[in-house]
Amino acid sequence: MREDVFAHSTGTGDKPEWLRERLKWFQSLKFGIILHWGVYSFWDCCESWPLVPDCDWSRRDEIRCWTERNKDIDWFQRDYRNLHKQFNPTGFDPDQWANLFVEAGAKYVCFTTKHHDGFCMWDTETTDYKITGEECPFHTNPNADVTKALFESCRRAGLAVSVYFSKADWHCPYYWSPEPRPMSQTANTVDDPETWEKFVQYTHRQIRELMTNYGKVDILWLDAGWVRGKEDIRMAEMVAMARELQPGLIVANRAVGDEFEDFVTPEREIPDDQLPDVWEACLPLGPDWKYVENQPLKSAAQVVEEIETANRRGGNFLLGIGPKYDGTIPDRDTEILLEIGRLRRN
């Protein structure tokens, strides 16, 4: 268990009444789905992390996309950053996805609008590195703005909406100084405040878009807790703006422990005891959060036990599912989700 997830427990007593009521509503949801889907869905590595030179764990010898490039990080990074040019998920059916999640018994959906690699799964005006960009063959599809299409389908199906957003962005030029080498040459917020201010504005513009153009948003799920402190994106200002646009918004500023971590998010493990905080355990269906062909998956019975354990201890359970690069939910995942729903109804 990552210690930083629990190190900043604040409880709910110091929160305003409206937020305490919203958190009670959130706790009533019990079970949700988190979707990791992006250009990384093409390859057999995990999402985003293989771009980082120091993250050897993410580029194991059995990972084909790594060995095919002679374990050359520059070659790997270059090809990764061009994956969007072949991203054409024509099998994407947002209504089918939403109905499947309802059948599984889920009450809310958290979608990766942007992971650490910086690829945007919505029609942002801040960058061309997006699914609606002209270099992406899917940009002419009626559902090219997959975030909008999915959230609309979710709401029609009665599902609450959670926006996953990475505070880190390993593609944005304002996040790096001087070259885009993830995690090793981040713009210095003290020595280069002008560049960092551009990144802060970039981030705020993206959050404003997501809070303005995508209907009712219930939860803002902010990842990349390691950027706390030295990489100040003026969280108070950003959250105030988001809540002005989305009244009642719940914010999970993950693993930071500030006043904007409305609930804590233990990852890959369920706490042994009830926590003083509102919490949500997030665990993937298989070893990876994203789609990896033929990876071992938990059984439906195992997942139901995890859901019930989390709920019994006072927490929500967020199940990680990885859609395929073609826009479909894998058959094995679909079968397990349907069986989860059957087991929980009996």
Feature map (PLM): residue ranges:
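Mature catalytic domains of secreted/periplasmic carbohydrate-active enzymes
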Residues: 1-346
